[in-house]
C-alpha cells in the first residue's frame, strides 16, 4: 500500500479525531470534560482543530494514501511544551465547565515526546506504525533531541514489544489520570 507521511492539515481533522480517541481511550473523557461519547468526540474534534493544545493538528502527522485517507497518525511535540499546551486546555475547561482539572505531565523537558500513535484498523499489519515511529525519530534528531519518548499502557503488551524492537527502553512506571503506564525512551545518535 502506497502512502506518504506528512504534517496534518485542517481537512484531515475529521479523520484524525477517531484515531486519537482509539489510542487514548477514556483519557478523552477527562480531556473534554464530557461523559457522553458523541459529545466527547465533538469536543475532541474541537481540540484537534485548536492550535494550542497537545492534540492539535499542528502537532500531528498523518500517513495518507493516494486518496487522502488517513491510515495512521502520530502526535508529537517538545517535552518542554507539554505543560504549556496543557495549561491552555486546563484554562479552557475551567472557563467552559467551571471545573478545574490537572493534566498529568507525560514527558521530561529534554525529550521529544510521542503523545499518541494509532493506525486505522484496516491498515494494521502493513508496517505503517513502524514507519510513523521511524518518522518521529527522524523529526526528533532533526530538531536536535537526543531522546525520543512515549508512554504506553502497562497492559498493551504487543505495543510494548514493538517499541522495544524499535529500540525503546522501559525506563520507569508512569501514571496518567490514575492509570498505570510505562515510560519508554529511545536514545538517538
Where do the model's predicted regions map?
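Conserved N-terminal entry element of GNAT/NAT acetyltransferase domains
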Residues: 1-11, 31, 189
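Conserved GNAT-fold acetyl-CoA-binding loop/helix
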Residues: 25-48, 93-94
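A short helix-loop-beta-strand connector motif used in the catalytic cores of GNAT acetyltransferases and
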Residues: 49-62, 80-84, 113
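Conserved beta-strand in the GNAT
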Residues: 62, 69-78, 113, 118
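Conserved acyl-donor/pantetheine-binding loop and adjacent beta-alpha core of acyl/acetyltransferases
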Residues: 78-112, 116
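Conserved catalytic-core motifs of GNAT/GCN5-like acyltransferases
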Residues: 80, 149-151, 164-183
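Conserved GNAT acetyl-CoA-binding A-motif
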Residues: 112, 124, 140-151
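Conserved acetyl-CoA-binding loop-helix of GNAT-fold acetyltransferases
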Residues: 125-138, 161-165
Amino acid at each position: 500500500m502506497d502512502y506518504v507521511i506528512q504534517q496534518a492539515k485542517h481537512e484531515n481533522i475529521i479523520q484524525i479525531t477517531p484515531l486519537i480517541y482509539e489510542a487514548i481511550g477514556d483519557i478523552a473523557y477527562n480531556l473534554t470534560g464530557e461523559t457522553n461519547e458523541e459529545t466527547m468526540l465533538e469536543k475532541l474534534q474541537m481540540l484537534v482543530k485548536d492550535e494550542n493544545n497537545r492534540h492539535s493538528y499542528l502537532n500531528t502527522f498523518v500517513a495518507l494514501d493516494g486518496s487522502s485517507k488517513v491510515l495512521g497518525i502520530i502526535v508529537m511535540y517538545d517535552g518542554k511544551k507539554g505543560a504549556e499546551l496543557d495549561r491552555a486546555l486546563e484554562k479552557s475547561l475551567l472557563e467552559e465547565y467551571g471545573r478545574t482539572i490537572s493534566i498529568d505531565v507525560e514527558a521530561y523537558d529534554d525529550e521529544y515526546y510521542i503523545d499518541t500513535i494509532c493506525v486505522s484498523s484496516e491498515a494494521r499489519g502493513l508496517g505503517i506504525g513502524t514507519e510513523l515511529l521511524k518518522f518521529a525519530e527522524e523529526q526528533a534528531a532533526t530538531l536536535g533531541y537526543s531522546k525520543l519518548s512515549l508512554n504506553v499502557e502497562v497492559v498493551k503488551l504487543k505495543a510494548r514489544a514493538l517499541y522495544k524492537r524499535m529500540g525503546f527502553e522501559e525506563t520507569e512506571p508512569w501514571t496518567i489520570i490514575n492509570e498505570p503506564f510505562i515510560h519508554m525512551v529511545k536514545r538517538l545518535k
